[in-house]
Structure formats: structure tokens, C-alpha cells
Amino acid sequence: MSQNSLRLVEDKSVDKSKALEAALSQIERSFGKGSIMKLGSNENVIEIETISTGSLGLDIALGVGGLPKGRIIEIYGPESSGKTTLALQTIAESQKKGGICAFVDAEHALDPVYARKLGVDLQNLLISQPDTGEQALEITDTLVRSGAVDVLVVDSVAALTPRAEIEGEMGDSLPGLQARLMSQALRKLTASISKSNTMVIFINQIRMKIGVMFGSPETTTGGNALKFYASVRLDIRRIGSVKEREEVIGNQTRVKVVKNKMAPPFKQVEFDIMYGEGVSKTGELVDLGVKAGIVEKSGAWFSYNSQRLGQGGENAKTFLRDNPDLAREIELALRENAGLIADRFLQNGGPDADDGDGADM
């Protein structure tokens, strides 16, 4: 008895390797080649493919240079905070690289004129305006499984009305119906999204929980499933107005990375969203450039590599808008120093009470 046990200990490594080989071959016979492999044997798995959000500061805050492909993203916030704008800017950036994009407009509120102003190629944008939540998610599932779509936006989770609710009476009480619909859909979608390398962005609204004494009373619609399945959750808020004399020409916006499976979360960034233009890219170049020491500020004058950009922020932005090559050069310099900028200059919001139940990892 003791000899057998000794022999097992001596041959333990050999037995384990043989047992592992037998298990791997059995799995491959049952489920096909490639159903299991060593992670390092496929270099493509390690690379994270991303698409820019249209905001340089947010790309840096995300830690990987943009939103990751093959993942579920949630963008939520109050009304008129810039949720759809951010999603459309991501579509525009993907289309610039030749990507195929789709927009599932459950709210039936997409403005094609505004989308074109943000740089979206309407001729090549797939759009669906479904009648029910089930139809919207079935269309999403079919497009994801095709493997041909790079970015798919669902606007919004709150508008994914279950068929039973539409067919029922106005005052009918149907608790948990939308949450169950989302939970089932995400269980089906998550594997297909990863295999097809499609980025699926769910836009969500916030609601108030009644009777909350401590912490934030805010919560997102559609139950808890999306919070768990999302790799990145962005909380977007309007914090002020951009004015030209007395006229309001844009919004000051703050985005907090509430959840991030790709890099450290809780980074916070602020930028301007201009009406009819989207994210002010030149404004970000000037602001981040000064913080990182790439753009020099002397009094009211801004300069880069001894070349004057202009007196005052607005003149510097106009100069960069008129000189796209120089703007691109500053952007590349900022992206090269992304790690330093993220650590030193992007505010770390931390999991505070403002996140409510949204700060989960």
C-alpha cells in the first residue's frame, strides 16, 4: 500500500500531464478543434482591438486607447447629457477605418441630420426601428452572429418594451418583465459578441429608487444583468454650458469610467460637446496639451515647439482647426504620453456615493 502511494507521488507530474493530454483530446473530439487551447499559443487573443470614442481624453482614461471590440459597453446618464452623441461619435470613428456599423433605434428618435454633422456616414449605417424589445434584441443577435458588424448601438435599454407590455392594457402591472428579457438576451449575446469581435453599446437611462436613505438613489433601467455583462460602464453628465457671449453653444461634459475590465477604473475626464459639432477635439488638444506640458502657455499665449497657436484658448482652437497636420502631431504626442496623463492629470473619481449601485467590478 505504501509502495503504491510512493510510486504515485514520484510519477505525479507524468500522470498529470498524461491525464491533461487525454482530457484535451477528449474535449477536442467532442466539441471540435480549438474549443480549448493554451492562452499564449494564440497571440491575437492578447491584443485588445479598440475604437476611439472621438474624445482623446476619454480614450486615455479608458487605458487601452478607446472602447474595446468584442465587448459589451454601457453608456448611461441623465437626459441630454450626451449619451447618443458619444455613441454616434464612436460609430463615426469606426466608419473612418472602414467598419460596418448598425444603430437599433428603440426610442425612434435618431436625428440623421445631427448624426451627419458628427461625421456618421448615413449611406453605410444600418438602422432598425423595432416595434418590441424582443424584436430589437433578436435583430441585435442576428447582426452580431453574422460577424460582419464592427459596432452596434442599442438606443436605449429603457425603450426595449416587452411584447406583453405593448399588447396589454395601459395600467397593467408586469413587474420584472424587462429585466428578465435583458437577462435572457445577454446570456445569449455575450458569447457571440466575443467570437464575432463586435462592440455592442447599450445606451441606458437613470431612474430614482424610492426610499433610499444612504448612498445614491439613482439606478439604471433593465435590471442588474447589464451591469455584470458590461466590460465598460460610462457615466456621462452635463456639468455646465459653453457660452459665446450670451449664447449657449455647447455643453461642458464629465464622463466617469465607473467599470473597466480592461484597465484601472474610476478615471474621470471633462470635455466640451459643441452643438452641431460633437466633442470639441481641438479644445481637448489645448487643455490636455497644457496639462501634459506638450503645449506651452505663457500668459494668454499658447505655443507648440516654439510655434505660436494663438492668444486665448478660442484662438488656439481655431488655429488648430485650420491646421489639421499640427493638430494631429499634438494628438500623437499626447497618445504617446497616455499613461503619464492618465496617472497624473485625469481625476480619479473613486467608487463614491455618486455611483450608487453602479461601481461594481
Curated annotation (Swiss-Prot):
Pfam families: RecA (PF00154), RecA_C (PF21096). Keywords: ATP-binding, Cytoplasm, DNA damage, DNA recombination, DNA repair, DNA-binding, Nucleotide-binding, SOS response. ATP binds at residues 77-84. One of its GO terms (molecular function) is ATP-dependent DNA damage sensor activity. GO terms for cellular component: cytosol. CDD domains: RecA (cd00983). It is found in: Cytoplasm. GO terms for biological process: DNA recombination; DNA repair; SOS response. Can catalyze the hydrolysis of ATP in the presence of single-stranded DNA, the ATP-dependent uptake of single-stranded DNA by duplex DNA, and the ATP-dependent hybridization of homologous single-stranded DNAs. It interacts with LexA causing its activation and leading to its autocatalytic cleavage. Belongs to the RecA family. This is Protein RecA.
